[in-house]
Design a protein with these regions (language model features):
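Metal-dependent phosphoester-hydrolase catalytic domains
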Residues: 51, 72, 76, 85-93, ...
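Generic enzyme active-site microenvironment
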Residues: 63, 95
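Surface-exposed cleft-lining segments at the edges of enzyme active sites
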Residues: 32-39, 64-72
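Charged active-site motifs of nucleotide-sugar-dependent glycosyltransferases
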Residues: 57-60, 91-92
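Structured beta-strand-rich core segments of catalytic domains in phosphoester-bond hydrolases
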Residues: 1-58, 145, 150-155
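Glycine-/small-residue-rich active-site loops that bind phosphorylated ligands and cofactors
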Residues: 15, 69, 99
Length: 173
């Protein structure tokens, strides 16, 4: 692919590993795993972050996948995400499967401290064959450093059970 990658393992699964992956056309460094509240004896949830090596800019990129069948854990995980990153001086982009629709508490909680890339449109991403739910998001902070150029759901149904979101953001100078 010609892309740079980092992988954060969550669990061993069926002879391999399951976790969060980050891909970038820019070099990635300093992979950090931020464990989220939940059920440690099951699939532990996390935010995986990397520094994106951009010329003259400081960007932290993260990915997450919140708990799928426990609303209380999802809300606690959203709060932990904000608590972990709210005081950092870096520009941060966070993408992931929140397993929650826009009106649900985890999304409402994150929007208190983060800007969401696609708040003006309903970008349904799940299930992949006939998307009827918006549960995947791209957030960023602080809001005055990036400008949204575009965002869209890509009609691709092979790589995942979710459709991907493509967003173009640019630095505000």
């Amino acid at each position: 692919t010609g892309m740079h990658a980092q992988f954060a393992r969550q669990i061993d699964f069926e002879g391999g590993q399951y976790g969060q992956a980050l891909l970038s056309r820019w070099p990635l460094a300093d992979l950090v795993i931020h464990w989220l509240p939940g059920e440690p004896e099951r699939e532990r949830r996390m935010v995986a972050t990397c520094s994106v090596q951009l010329p003259g800019k400081q960007l932290l990129f993260g990915t997450t996948h919140l708990h799928h069948n426990n609303a209380d854990f999802r809300l606690r995980q959203a709060r932990a995400i904000t608590d972990s990153f709210v005081d950092l001086p870096a520009t941060i982009i966070l993408a992931g499967d929140l397993n929650a629709e826009p009106q649900h508490p985890p999304v409402v909680e994150l929007i208190k401290s983060w800007s969401v890339v696609h708040s003006a449109t309903n970008l349904r991403t799940f299930p992949v064959d006939k998307p009827s739910k918006q549960i995947d998001y791209i957030f960023y902070r602080p809001s005055d450093r990036l400008r949204i150029v575009s965002s869209e759901v890509i009609a691709e149904a092979v790589a995942s059970d979710h459709r991907p979101i493509l967003a173009v953001l640019e630095w505000v100078e």
